[in-house]
Design a protein with these regions (language model features):
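NTP-dependent nucleotidyl-transfer catalytic core
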Residues: 1-229
Length: 229
């Protein structure tokens, strides 16, 4: 039982981020791959004496939730999301997405919903929590079968109120420039497209929240290494 055990990780902290499914969407083979590889790495590092932190960085925020909220407002009573959350929420998302393609005003309503969610609108927040809780219930049915556990479920939403500092740091260091009302980082010297940090309507994107996550984790865990699986 002790074969391969070591203390080479003594007094060192490592973060392993794995699984990270999207709320209100199916848990697919890609999520299964990162879940199993991440669990293996988590167990190995723990066996080597590291203070190992397993994080499930849930995809629980973003403009898609503006669409989910709009779809639920329009047709929620037609779907049984309580008994079959992922399948029914997916149907709502597909339906509202199709409508957005043909009607720009609906897409604008969805964007406004997400803006309200960011600002803490009670109705939007309550719906978001409902989608998240129902999705997690389904995800944990799978995690329990695989004997997978996490130390943190802090996803994108957790960092949504921590992005102002990221923007402030980037502005102070001269890395942000304005483009068509949005705030971006120019990555032309890296031969990459620009990275949007703040949209013209003031909303943040995944990259903004990911930077906030890195900053928060560094302060919380003072980690030596962070693995993204």
């Amino acid at each position: 039982d002790e074969y391969g055990k070591s203390d080479i990780g003594k007094n060192k902290t490592i973060i392993v981020e794995y699984s990270s499914p999207n709320i209100a969407k199916p848990f697919h083979i890609g999520h299964l791959r990162t879940t199993l590889i991440g669990k293996a790495l988590y167990d190995i590092y723990k066996y080597l004496g590291y203070n190992t932190i397993g994080i499930n960085h849930l995809g629980d925020y973003g403009t898609q939730f503006g669409k989910m909220i709009e779809g639920y407002k329009r047709w929620g009573q037609e779907y049984n999301i309580e008994d079959n959350p992922i399948e029914e929420l997916t149907k709502i998302y597909v339906r509202i997405n199709e409508l957005c393609k043909s009607d720009e005003s609906v897409l604008e309503d969805c964007r406004e919903n997400f803006k309200k969610l960011e600002e803490g609108d009670k109705y939007c927040v309550e719906l978001w929590k409902k989608f998240r809780d129902l999705s997690l219930k389904e995800f944990y049915r799978i995690y329990d079968l695989l004997d997978v556990k996490f130390d943190s479920l802090n996803g994108e939403a957790f960092y949504s109120d921590k992005t102002d500092e990221v923007i402030e740091i980037l502005e102070k260091t001269g890395k942000l420039i304005e483009s068509n009302g949005a705030k971006i980082i120019d990555l032309e010297d890296k031969k990459m497209p620009p990275c949007i940090i703040c949209k013209s309507n003031g909303s943040t994107i995944y990259a903004t929240r990911d930077l906030a996550a890195i900053l928060c984790r560094a302060r919380t865990y003072d980690f030596d290494k962070c693995l993204y699986v």
